[in-house]
């Protein structure tokens, strides 16, 4: 499940039933999304997120909070620390692969621990330098409640190895009526930097 195989699954290969499930699990806002541009950065797009965009060749992300500050999922985002990543060009391929293996093994350990607690969760290679572990809610819940829960989950996890970073999504308890909060990249995307 945590294999870094870029061609093992593709969002373009999903059938209609799987596409509907994907949207149900991951899309909380359809009026805005983030799109990765050529240099690897993301740009906010304030237009409807259509199936053509979501399941096309673009790399896109979702904003967790809806306009009422409710969420439908949570995510642990394990990455190689930015300071280490900034030195990637001076590393050998083997050194970089060791960092990828470190984040992979730590994510596997956390996933196994969460499974031992009977906490349903789903890992994925997020592309480039890390992994996500997703949690799906039975119904939309206030982001503040989900943030408290995900912070509690983080406190239960094995200690982070030096050189790794962990982000929690959602990152906000609430947003203003015209706010967006942070986004997280959808699964099955091709990271333009990798």
Please name every model-derived segment.
Residues 161-194:
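Catalytic "initiation/cleavage/transfer" segments centered on a nucleophilic residue
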Residues 2-131, 136-152:
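Signature for HUH/AEP ssDNA processing cores
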Residues 151-161:
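A common structural junction motif
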Residues 1, 13, 159, 163-167:
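Acidic/proline-rich low-complexity IDRs
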